[in-house]
Amino acid sequence: MSLRQTVARSLPYRIARPAVRALRARLNGPSATSAPAAPPMPVYFPRTLALPEDTPEQRAIVEEVKQHSWYHTIDLGQGIRTPGRFDHIPPLHHYPMPLDLTGKRCLDVATFDGFWAFEMERRGAAEVVALDIDSWLDLDVPPYILEDFKRRGVTTKTGVGFEIAHKVRNSKVDRRICNVYDLSPEKFGEFDFVFCSDVLVHITNPIRALENICAVTKGEAVFVEGYAPGSAGMGPWITLLAQLDNSAWWMFGRDFLSKAALAAGFARVEASPDIDVRQRATPDAPMQRLMLRAINNR
């Protein structure tokens, strides 16, 4: 194999080449034979914080909200929104979640503060189960992350934000402590709709997790994950990040998730348009997300 062929097949070259092509096209302008440009990816930023303290009841809720470091921005009513790192409410219409879940049994995998579980409940679900781990030390993240937690004395139990939102919203969502590796129809039965967001890149065995989710899904599951920009058309590749000072184990290629979901047993998959949802603390950093419907219809 020539040096040129070796370089062309290397992963860095395959990752960089689409970006170089895009830059070249941008500098040179579109050619007469070039394909129509794809529509720009929608970008969503967190809204301004809303923590009014005009009434005694609002003040009591806000005081409780301020005691927690929030991952999700959740509408608690009375004009109060939690100051979450991510605000999924503005782009909510882009997510492929059915508008009407009346009578459905639903599952939220890795619920954290519970935004998606409460949203499924709001859409009429008959039952919502919210899966979570018990402690930060139960996370399946790279070992040096856990060692850092231990050095800093981080043993915090999860679910604090969930319990606050659950109480204020008068919710009936059922939060269960269970690792996704232990998820099974024997323990939980089957679900009409499953939502799983930003989980697979953070665990050692995403295929096993997909298999377990498939086993409890009798209708459809929606997966939302980050992916490598510029990786469309490069095949279902996956690369290891765990030694790069990152809380994720993996970086997925654009086509990995659909192929992995089919390999895990789902009958068919449908991709939805990607979006870019920015973090509150770093609004200038792109956070591209791919969204996939995986369907069983058992």
Task: Outline where the language-model segments fall.
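Conserved alpha-helix/loop element of class I SAM-dependent methyltransferases that forms part
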Residues: 81-104
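Short alpha-helix
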Residues: 157-165, 248-265
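Conserved class I S-adenosyl-L-methionine
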Residues: 104-112
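Conserved beta-strand signature within the Rossmann-like core of class I S-adenosyl-L-methionine
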Residues: 218-229
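Membrane-proximal basic amphipathic "stem/tether" segments
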Residues: 1-61
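A short, conserved alpha-helix within the catalytic core of class I
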Residues: 202-217
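A conserved beta-strand element that flanks and buttresses the S-adenosyl-L-methionine
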Residues: 195
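Short, glycine-/aromatic-enriched active-site segment of Class I SAM-dependent methyltransferases
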Residues: 227-248
